[in-house]
Amino acid sequence: MKQYDRMISSLLYSWKIKDEYREELSKKRGEFLDKFNSTSYNDFKTREELIRGWFKYVGKNPCINKPFHCDYGCHISVGDYFFANFNCTMLDVAPITIGNHVFLAPNVAIYTAGHPISAKIRQEDLEYGKPVVIGDDVWIGGNSVINPGVRIGSNVVIGSGSVVTKDIPSGVIAAGNPCRVIRKIDAKEEQKWQEKADEFYDDLRKEGISL
């Protein structure tokens, strides 16, 4: 089995063993990042074209602010209306799959890459990856880290500075290091924000503004 196939299958692999396909992907990754991060700040169109040409899947109306960093890029899938703010890092030695309407605040890091606990085996330059899956309608606060193998459900808020080491269920607010569920997002919470939104739209109508 080639080292790339081992890597993408969450098996131990060695980056020191020659694998032409993996090396070609790494080269293309560098070219992609050079182009992406050299765009002008307001050139959203070019950045969208670049990620559509390199990510595994991209839904409608994505927006990623530069700088952006990744291990490969071609193992990343993002759904509709995906937004990543400044300095997002995705280490995608295994697949990263993100749903619709997901917001990443500045300095969010999503890691699929891992190293053996054994120092002896680490010294042999063996590594592994575990996929990360994020559902729909998720907001991840700034400076948060999503660790290898984590699954985050849908309709979730992750508080700033969280270190997510275990799965997070749907419909909750979670935060901390390690990240834990704080409370459920219940009907009362939904009603509170609906009332705030209704007030906002009422103000727009009074001002003669339509969206």
What residues fall within each predicted segment?
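Flexible, glycine/small-residue-enriched loop-and-beta-strand segment within the central core
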Residues: 41, 68-78, 83-151, 177-178, ...
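Arg/Lys-rich RNA-binding interfaces used to dock onto structured RNA substrates
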Residues: 50, 66-69
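Terminal amphipathic alpha-helical/low-complexity segments used for targeting or macromolecular assembly
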Residues: 1-61, 179-183, 187-211
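Acidic, glycine-centered active-site loop in nucleotide-sugar glycosyltransferases
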Residues: 169-170, 175-178
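A generic "structured core" feature
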Residues: 63, 133-135, 139, 151, ...
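Gly/Ser/Thr-rich helix-start
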Residues: 11, 142, 160-162, 177
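Short, T/G/N/S-enriched strand-turn elements that build extracellular solenoid repeat scaffolds
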Residues: 53, 76-78, 168
